[in-house]
């Protein structure tokens, strides 16, 4: 089923994706395609860019979250992880850094400056993120994504993605 989906996806590409997230938004703006996949925080970076050309791109596209139907799984959410090496010589400071990064103060900054959603449940998304609307996130465990990685890569290779 996944391979058929991937094959259909590839067959519907207006063009082979090239460049970064910004390039995908520009491609929509220039009429090269009607839809693209990007990390949402680039939408905010473009919207508030110092480059008026980039602001123009984002003013002419709409951000949507996929898989939001009643029986859909929700949108995939990227995560950033942190850890402490087993033999770290500075575990206390490493732990203090991780605790700060997940603190209310740091999580608010991530949202306001980098347009990222908070991982700390005590922190609301920034006002800009709230303007984009609510969405249901996919709750597939990250370990399952990791387990399916090698098979996913084989499928991608077979369908010429």
Task: Name these PLM-found stretches.
Residues 100, 104-161:
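Extracellular/periplasmic juxtamembrane helices and adjacent flexible linkers that interface
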Residues 7, 22, 26, 30, ...:
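Solvent-exposed, polar/charged alpha-helical surfaces in well-ordered, non-transmembrane soluble domains
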Residues 58-82:
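A contiguous binding-surface segment within folded domains or other stable secondary-structure elements
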Residues 12, 27, 31, 46-49, ...:
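Structured segments of extracytoplasmic/periplasmic soluble domains
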Residues 77-90, 109-110:
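A bilobed periplasmic-binding-protein/Venus flytrap-type ligand-binding module shared by bacterial periplasmic
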Residues 1-66:
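Ligand-binding pocket segment of bilobal, Venus flytrap-like solute-binding proteins
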Residues 41-44, 68-72, 89, 103-107:
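Solvent-exposed loop/turn segments at secondary-structure junctions
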Residues 1, 88-94:
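Short helix-loop capping/hinge motifs at secondary-structure junctions, enriched
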């Amino acid at each position: 089923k996944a391979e058929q989906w991937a094959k259909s996806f590839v067959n519907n590409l207006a063009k082979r994706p090239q460049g970064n997230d910004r390039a995908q938004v520009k491609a929509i703006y220039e009429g090269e395609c009607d839809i693209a996949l990007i990390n949402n925080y680039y939408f905010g970076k473009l919207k508030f860019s110092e480059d008026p050309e980039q602001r123009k791109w984002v003013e002419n596209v709409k951000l949507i979250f996929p898989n939001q139907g009643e029986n859909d799984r929700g949108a995939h959410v990227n995560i950033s992880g942190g850890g402490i090496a087993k033999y770290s010589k500075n575990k206390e400071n490493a732990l203090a850094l991780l605790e700060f990064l997940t603190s209310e103060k740091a999580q608010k900054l991530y949202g306001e400056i980098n347009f990222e959603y908070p991982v700390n449940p005590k922190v609301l998304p920034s006002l800009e993120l709230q303007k984009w609307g609510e969405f249901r996130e996919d709750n597939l465990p990250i370990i399952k994504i990791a387990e399916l990685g090698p098979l996913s890569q084989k499928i991608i290779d077979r369908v010429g993605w």
